[in-house]
């Protein structure tokens, strides 16, 4: 199910060990530390390989995440807002990543711009609780979704390039 490139990407993202969600206030801070370390490592790896494609930050509690992601298509950079909340049942439940400005533009999306990850990503996440975290959700959830959906939306004329100069 996982190709060699994805397997290599995954092997370079640290696995998490602490099983805690926002409800476990005492150990949630430790889980957040692991999350940030994994995200930093993933972003560093992406930069080194020339495939830097997102920026994320969170609120103080680490329960709301937001930022930008981008996809290069025909040498043009398509940029989107990305956001998600950490579910109270995290890490058992994966975050639902949303690209609000694409809401309603593809069938592979739920209300509010939440991308569809049901068939491929969620079973993989479930098998890897608590080892997978936000970096894994970006690598195995959002990245492949962008790679499939954005070129299709561009081809159909649903989204167009915006010059940000």
Swiss-Prot record:
The active site is at residue 116. The keyword Cytoplasm does not apply. The keyword Lyase does not apply. One of its GO terms (cellular component) is cytoplasm. Keywords: Ubl conjugation pathway. InterPro entries: UBQ-conjugating_enzyme/RWD, Ufc1. Pfam families: UFC1. E2-like enzyme which forms an intermediate with UFM1 via a thioester linkage. This is Ubiquitin-fold modifier-conjugating enzyme 1. It comes from Drosophila virilis.
